[in-house]
Swiss-Prot record:
Belongs to the ribonuclease III family. The keyword Metal-binding applies. It is found in: Cytoplasm. It catalyses: Endonucleolytic cleavage to 5'-phosphomonoester. This is Ribonuclease 3. Its cofactor is Mg(2+). It comes from Geobacillus thermodenitrificans (strain NG80-2). The lineage of its organism: Bacteria, Bacillati, Bacillota, Bacilli, Bacillales.
Amino acid sequence: MSKQRDKGRIYEKRRAKFQELQKKIGITFQNEKLLIQAFTHSSYVNEHRRRFHEDNERLEFLGDAVLELTVSQYLFQKFPHMSEGQLTKLRAAIVCEPSLVKFANALSFGELVLLGKGEELTGGRTRPALLADVFEAFIGALYLDQGMDVVLRFLGQTMFPKIDEGAFSHVMDFKSQLQELVQRDGSGTLEYAILEEKGPAHNKEFVARVALNGQELGVGVGRSKKEAEQHAAQMALETLRAADKQ
C-alpha cells in the first residue's frame, strides 16, 4: 500500500511540473500524454516495461523536420537579401545541438525528463545530446497537439528573438550581403571607415561606419575592426530594408 502511495505522490509531483511548464509557456496541451512522451527517454521505457510508455524518439524525428521548416521560413522572410548558402549556414547554427541545448536549458527542460536509473546516475539529465533531442521532441509534440501556428508562436517567444538580438551574428556575413545588394542594384560604391578606437589595449572597442557614395548607411561597434564593420553593415542592411518597405 505504501508503495502505491509513493507512486501516486511521484505521479502527482510529475504532473504538477508539466502543468507548471504549460503555464510558463502559455500553452495548454489537449493531449497531455503527448507532452509527457516528449520528455520520456528510452532508458525510462526499458525500466518500466510493465506499464506502457512510449519514448520520445519518434517525436524527435518529427520535431527535427518541423524546426527545419519553421526556421527556414523565418529566415527566408527576415533576410530577403541573404543568399541560399548563407541561409543554410545560419539555419544550421540555429538548429545545431549546442543551440538547442541553450533553448532547452532556458525552459529547464532537463528537470522534466523521465530517465532510467542508470542514465540518471551517469548524468543523463544534463547531457547535451539528450537535451537537444528533448527540445526537438517537444516541438514535435507541440505540432501534433496544437498545429503549426502555435509552434510558430512558441518559437516567436523563445528562438526567433535570439536571432533578432544577434545571437548568431558570428555566422552571418553582413558585409557580403550588403555588397551583393549594392552590386545587384548598381547603386554605387561602399566605403568602410573606423571612426573611433576606445578603451585600453587589452579591451579595445572600435566604432566603424559604412557609407554608400559618401552617404552614411550604418554605424557599428565591435571588439575588433572586423566585428565593428560587420555590425555597421548589419545596420546598413536594416536601413535599406526599412526604405524598401516605405
